Amino acid sequence: MRLIQTLSSCLCTGIIALFTACSQAPQSPIDSVDPFIGTGFHGHTYPGATAPYGAVQLSPDTRKGNWDACSGYHYSDSTLMGFSHTHLSGTGCIDLGDILFRPSLQTPLAFSHSDEKASPGYYSVNLKEAGVLAELTTTPHVGIHRYTYKKGIEATLVVDMDHLLDNEYMYEGWVKRTGDNELTGMRRTRGWVDNQYVFFVAQFSQPFSSMEQPSERQAVLTFDTTTGKPIVCKVGVSIVNEENARLNLEQETDSYGFDFDAIHQATRSDWEKELDVITVEGGTEAERTNFYTALYHSKIIPNIASDVNGQYRRHDMSVATIPAGRRQFSTFSTWDTFRAWHPMMTLLDTTLVNDMVQSLLDMYDASGELPLWPLSAGETGTMIGYHSTSIIADAYLKGIRGYDAEHALEAMKISAEKNKKGADYYIKEGFIPTNIKKESVSCLLEFAYDDWCIAQMAKALGHMDDYETFIKRSQNFINVFDGSTRFFRGKRQDGNWEAPFDPFAIGRSYTEATAWQYRFFTPHDVYGLTQLFGGREAFIADLDSLFMVTSEVVGDLVDVTGLVGQYAHGNEPSHHMAYLYSYVGQPWKTQEWTRRLLDEMYQPTPEGIIGNEDCGQMSAWYILSSLGFYSVCPGSNQFILTTPLFDKANMKLGNGKTLVITANQPDKNKYITKVTLNGEEISHCYITYDQLMQGGTLDFTLSATPDKRWGTAPEYAPYSYTEQPTVSIPYIANDLDLFEGEITAELKSTTPEAVIHYTLDGSEPDENAPVYSEPFVLKETMIIKAKGYKKGFVPSRTYSIQATKAVLRPALSIQPTKHGVAYTYYEGEFQWVADLQKAKVVETGTIPEPSILNAKLPDHFGYIFTGYIYAPEDGVYEFSTRSDDGSVLYIGKEKVVDNDASHAAIDATGRIPLQKGYHPFALHYFEDYEGEYLGWSWRTPSMSKLDAIPTENLYIN
């Protein structure tokens, strides 16, 4: 359209412009990168300078103390506090922001985005009001600043070790002058991870004119700029000690002196090499920008944790030295990156993969457990699963083996046994009781996949006993599948489902998700999952529904973004789901949905990443999907095929070979009709790692309409552990917990024509047990077990549930007359309500009902409310709390509602039989950080739904 308009207005000029455009070479990968992508919305990336996998991330800080401050920068801001040397990319938690430099006494400093520039290894901003141009570049361990002050402006530079992006605790810190043009400093903090050390040595291109210290952790420097020369500062950083910070500075920058441009060019050359690993042709300019920016974001993490002399700080705080040629890494968001980022790196950089596995094993050696989310020299403990096992197994099974495999298997097994997030119940009971542990369903599903990974590693090493143990555990997902709803659901310790159940609700049984977003997470056994649904047709119908139902969710969770139906591309549990159609004979739907997600979820704008970028995972999804394959099940060595986005792509593989990917007019055609590798046709809807690593040409023949023949036969489906038709586990739809009088139980199975055998005495049913034929009545507490059978099918797992007859809790023989509740108010940092008992009491008093509106702090406080609640009738009562963060409700000494731990606003419920009368209660609550909320409600025996507890039913004695 622009060309037509130009020709209409000036034909001659248009022809010249057209000729010039046609003769220009395509833009290089590095010039297609836009570091501002992801700095808006909730992408949480930063625009500043860093080297590939650099230990230093030198970037502006525009905000702190809230969720969108995770990277220190948000595009919606128009002022900045300065430039600090460490940052996280795309995370959902805040930390770092170490060693702030601010080239002015003014704070904050106003700026305009029109005065910013950013490219790999470089950032600049013209701070016009302050009269200074700030430019930043880095080497792996050194941040380099260049400040050009406007004539007549006093050249002042503030160095601030008090600056924090979050409310961290400062153990110690200082800044010292160690020369006419040199500062040194350090600090040790407790933030997202404890005992974070950072040391620096800063050298300046000219001596200070003066230095003042408002505190021991701050310095104000002035310089003589009458010569008109800019001030260049080089800041060497280490988490080990000052000597290493100096050594990093000397070895990486001494040869350049204070030549900012030369250092920048060297780092730019490093980035050109890193980004040249994949080049693409075709596509739109926006798509190429998205692609190369994704590639850039995938190479700024993890971060090098070892210094130039090989020393690094271990998770036990000791200092060790790695062998020559190796690097120690940290900043692993394993819950996110095991899915696509790590499998992608097995294709691109096997040396990096070996170094990462060695790093994970070193963390195990120092702490006794493989990490979940390591940062700096410690473990944050954030997120669920034990996905280091997936990363290690995937590497080993692909032949990347530069480490002690037996030691790795030992680490995997021990970590699976030690994991604190319900693994003890998972191992003993086969499920995690939702009334005891939050995130129980998500934890179980991810434990099951990780156990499959351990089983594959054990099998490859010939440890068949371990294989049998862990492969059996990998099937535990069956135990939380509810056939009546065809969802994975929270199960209480007695085997009854958590109620009420709303698959659209953000509940305590799931991690950053609704039930929809964990409905299809069995990457190691998709065929087994289809059997639970009752077969292919039911599975496909429900998978279709995922993308078609309403995108509304009940509750508030900022991580659930990028919704198409209940598919949430902005958070990782959904990332594999579009590829599941290829497992059930409809690969054309995989091709259709992946193209739509590529088009809609990524844009070349600051808001262009639809959720947290998450340390490269969102980018890796884009890269792999646009190349035409994706790893649904790391450890299987299979990549599911889909339609490429570009006409041609060249991948430099980690073994030195090159893979060329071609596709005919993917801008017009999004369906696969044929795939060949080096001329040989691939009939399966997947390709293996070994095939890809052969290199050569992977060619896709595409069409504009779906080809419903290619890849649809069952034998062409990808790997699943279950190979035989299997009866779905039986279920009872109604709740048998705390029934009054008698209750009817009805057994069912989603498998058509399944025969159910059952027992009522807790014994294991077999084909000799009674056959279920009709609903039966229960009048006493008992354990029901059931198992499904069908000719030609593998029998189901055993279903177990306890039916419990209600026994009323006696009321107290008291007659309180004063309405209200007593409260005790605490302040401090809490992770569990039990932490309140260790905190100092700040205030006590009475109020009409539990409320946190009078808290004296916005964050880090807690309450314990006590009193008596009047139950107006005999029967079973349901209580609920909705809280942000944790809450627990006791009636007498019985824990009725467990909504504990640090989390966003979610609901939890519990039931208890009460005699009419007065019962003591205690409601414990704490607020960690950000949002805060507390509400409670009940449903009496005569009520049909939950409602607020009336103040007239609350008493103090």
Predicted features by range, described:
Residues 674-676, 755-759, 880, 888-890, ...:
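Beta-strand signatures of extracellular beta-sandwich domains
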